UniProtKB/Swiss-Prot annotation:
Database matches in SUPFAM superfamilies: Nucleotide-diphospho-sugar transferases (SSF53448)
Residue ranges with Acidic residues bias: 192-202
Gene Ontology molecular function terms on file: chitin synthase activity
This enzyme's EC code(s): 2.4.1.16
Gene: CHS2
Domain of life: Eukaryota
Name used for this protein in its record: Chitin synthase 2
Lineage: Eukaryota, Fungi, Dikarya, Ascomycota, Saccharomycotina
Transmembrane segments: 647-667, 682-702, 722-742, 757-777, 804-823, 930-950, 967-987
Reactions catalysed according to its record: [(1->4)-N-acetyl-beta-D-glucosaminyl](n) + UDP-N-acetyl-alpha-D-glucosamine = [(1->4)-N-acetyl-beta-D-glucosaminyl](n+1) + UDP + H(+)
One of the protein's GO biological processes: chitin biosynthetic process
Amino acid composition bias (Polar residues), ranges on this chain: 1-12, 34-62
Family, per entry: Belongs to the chitin synthase family.
Keywords: Cell membrane, Cell wall biogenesis/degradation, Glycosyltransferase, Membrane, Transferase, Transmembrane, Transmembrane helix
Amino acid sequence: MSYNNPNNSNSHLRPHAYNNSRRDDSDGDESSIEFLNQRSNTPLTQGTYNYHNTSTNSLNFQQPEPIYRNQTRTSLSDSYYDHPIFDTSQTQIQPPHDNPFTESYEMTDTSYQGNDHHYRTGQPNHLMNPTYNQAFIPHVYDEEDNDEQEYDQRIQYNQFQGDHFDLAAISYADDESQSQLDYVPTERVIPEGEEEEEEGETSFEKEPGSETISGPFGEERSFEEPPPQQEVRSKKLTRATGLNGHLVLDCPVADELLSKFPDYNPAEKSGGLSREFAFMRYTAVTCGPSNFYRDAYILRPVHYPIPRQTELMIVITMYNEDDILLGRTLKGVFKNIKYLESKARSSTWGKDSWKKIVVCIVSDGRTKINERAQALLAGLGVYQEGLAKSRVDDKKVQAHMFEYTTRVGISKVTDDVVKLTTEKVVPVQMLFCLKETNAKKINSHRWCFQAIGQVLDPKIVVLLDCGTQPSGRSLYELWKEFDRDHRVAGACGEITTSLKKRQMITNPLVYGQNFEYKISNILDKPTESSFGFISVLPGAFSAYRFIALQNDINGIGPLEKYFKGEFLHSSGELDPNDDEFQMKHLMLKEEAGIFTSNMYLAEDRILCFELVAKRGCNWLLRYCKSARAETDVPEGLAEFILQRRRWLNGSFFAAIYSLVHFYKVWTSSHSFGRKIFLHIEFFYQLINLIVSWFSIGSYFLVFRILTTSLGDKALGFAPGKILSVIFLWLYLASIVTTFVLSFGNKPKGTEKFYVTIVIFFAILMAYMIFAAIFMAVHSIQDIYRSGTRITVSLFFQNSEFRDLVVATSSTYALYFLASFLYFEPWHMFTSFVQYILLSPSYVNVLNIYAFCNIDDISWGTKGEVGGKSLGEAKLREDGTFDVSVPISKEQINQSYLDQLEKIRDPAPPEEKVLVTNTEDYYAFIRSMTVLVWMFTNFVVIALVLETGGFNQFVEATDLANLKSNRAAVFLTVILWTVAFMALFRFIGCIYYLITRLGREIKASEHATK
């Protein structure tokens, strides 16, 4: 088999290159339909794509022509891609083999014949498997969304064609005979005392009894379970040819999965499916993301005879989220891809749109990934157990990449289980990048932008967090923002919170965050979008134009600034053997410091500023309200505090960064008017920064003024004075407690204290609202009693009433008005009260904890060295690899069923075991000691100097005498106490002197005797 690289003369066979000029994606363009039909009917056999040569039986892994070379340019930034995708001087063509493994990772094994029948029922084997039946169900439409049915009517599901490119990854050893293979297939162990049966006989007897299971569509089937079969897996090394000197394997997908596809034909090879659907590729990456492109790693979309142009790369970052959160995100993404496939009148989308989209899932750490989430990916076909290796030729593997074009969709996601389907599914090109170690989310983005993105060269990159579910048309709406205006470098949509009705009362924290998100999407984001600069595009749901992110020829630019945060927050010392050692060392040497490190906790804010202020460019940022995504928010207070610590510190220092470097805007290509508007926005951000800085002091003053005013005798509220003193002491106690807990204590270890403080501030806020209303009503009553003519101006002559009305209307009234103008008022009725009661905690608790932990520049995760070894692939002298992988159909099918078993049933409830960490316990004792010490001293001071509000109970004429008398008493007590202690010590020393003198006299008398 050989693969001949197309030369430049065949460039007309490639998909048309990206063009940054505006394209009208309007419906009704018949010429665009004709264009799509012509392009989709282009035969794949044109040109010189002779990738199968039976005469030579050789492997030729020359690289396909990079798409970047013939890319249409419309800006100077495109020169970034002038260099070829691969350096051919470093690429070595693999030597030919005498006996190539022509079936590409398939052995001629008669032990399993794919879609065979069950030994009793005569049914296909996969239909009789209970695990398989419970994992797959028919396609189910969402009750709240009927658009998907309309999409299905415009899609021809029986006409999907994948690519047939063949990468021969496994071969027999050329120095051994057919009977001495490098790999021995799985064999069944015959128990001692039994004879081996002849071929064709069954190795077990029928047993009475049967088990009833549900079929794939809900029907009941009865079959008898065979006894367990003992297997021994005597795997030896198998020869792998690799690609460009890297371990790359094309692995067959389990027949248990392929047999579910509507066009599967068991009589044909690979079920009659194209290799793109029948094989999954694994690549062991032994370099860092910055060297992925340089080291000539290649991905499937650009490795086909006609390389595919990626219009949209969807990046999903994952840490330890379970299968439910991952399933929600993938369900939303798959639905969006189906919508793009259904757009028959679009010049860009429509038939075969799935070939322009790559879904990239990056998991942060092999030992951190959730087992059920990994099993879900295996159910989709994009992951197989047993392929990954920890080392390749003594080099550590830094990432495991699995590529597959899946035709498995997600039918339904409940609160506890994910159901798969193969009905009405549009193919999806998926890439699963499993990082070997946990290196934080920003490192995951670096793998996408610096490694995967450099090879695929997508036009638009969409960032999603695992658990964020985009609505049915959100990705198209985001893409349209870039297509309409070539100046748009980044865009974000509206993020909504996942709400449960019962949490409205049981967990007001969730609904309070919902109100915060809604107001931000109604007031903040649209305002910033009007200026062309959004201070932060949330990493949970945003999109960027890939070419706008690129650095200049000197390596300076948005991505360079964006990725500095990874090196500043890295834990531990740098590894000298790391291929990125010099780059990381240089970053740390130039940028280390608390200010810079905290600034890069909000690296997405730095990226936004660098895009708008990019030298010689006029990029803009937009907010797309029609694009929506739902996400989960922290439900626990400890998790919420930790999240906001990073947000507040990062946004505070990032705001300072943008204000200090505002002059960079003048080096951009923005018009003079745009630069003036940007400066107006910067001035607004400066005011907002000042208000945030003094927010805790301002809130205390408002509290003190309202409570003391309510205690005035003229208002006639008798408990006012007493309550003002009680709330003052509790307020100060809460503030001091928060300060003490914030220094060195983890919120999870002292969560009960934080809950108590938040509840107190909620009660305090309710009292302050009552005080404001009571005083306003009293002012109106005074006006009526005075008999003065009622006018509008009269209400504003009363200073207290005027200030209250202005402050209230400028916030809460505007919230109502803006919400109704956007036709989204419901959060004002369901979440407004919760947010108001939580607002004091936002000001006091969150700000105090954030500023007390400025020195904590971590993301809440620590680097680790990885889990147990997965084995090693050895490089031979001829450039091939010796590797041990499962290759028999029995193993592959059993592995697939084992993965489905993990997600078949809901996950068992987690047992909440209260384990007190020793460090948390000692920190708790320390904090309590400090608090008792501080409060007892404060009580003495307050009683003596009348500073704790006690002066409110004393008449002004007697206040001076009372203070003087208490001070005199205090001094008298202190002086006499000091005198007594001195006298006591004097008596003690005299007694010691007398007794010592007595002992010496006795000793001398005894000596004379």
